């Protein structure tokens, strides 16, 4: 499993988890966040490995569909990048303005 895909699915899961069913949340969380194998999940929930695989693949598609419609993750990435650029600019050009730096730091803390 490619690390980029794992990171993307985890990020999408962070944004869209409340929109998933309990089973989808459980399987995708165990597989991507907790690094369980398909076999381990299947054994724990007394279902076939194929059933787990199908559920995870279907959930991945659902997460990608949510993102294609809502763009929450993409917008978060763009906002984070712009905030980083702003902070860098302010530190380079307005380092003496402590109030400005404080306000930017407050914005950064809202992302967490």
From Swiss-Prot:
Gene3D superfamilies in UniProt: Winged helix-like DNA-binding domain superfamily/Winged helix DNA-binding domain (1.10.10.10)
Pfam families, sorted: UPF0122 (PF04297)
Family of the protein in this entry: Belongs to the UPF0122 family.
Protein purpose: Might take part in the signal recognition particle (SRP) pathway. This is inferred from the conservation of its genetic proximity to ftsY/ffh. May be a regulatory protein.
Protein name: UPF0122 protein LSL_0628
Originating organism: Ligilactobacillus salivarius (strain UCC118)
Lineage: Bacteria, Bacillati, Bacillota, Bacilli, Lactobacillales
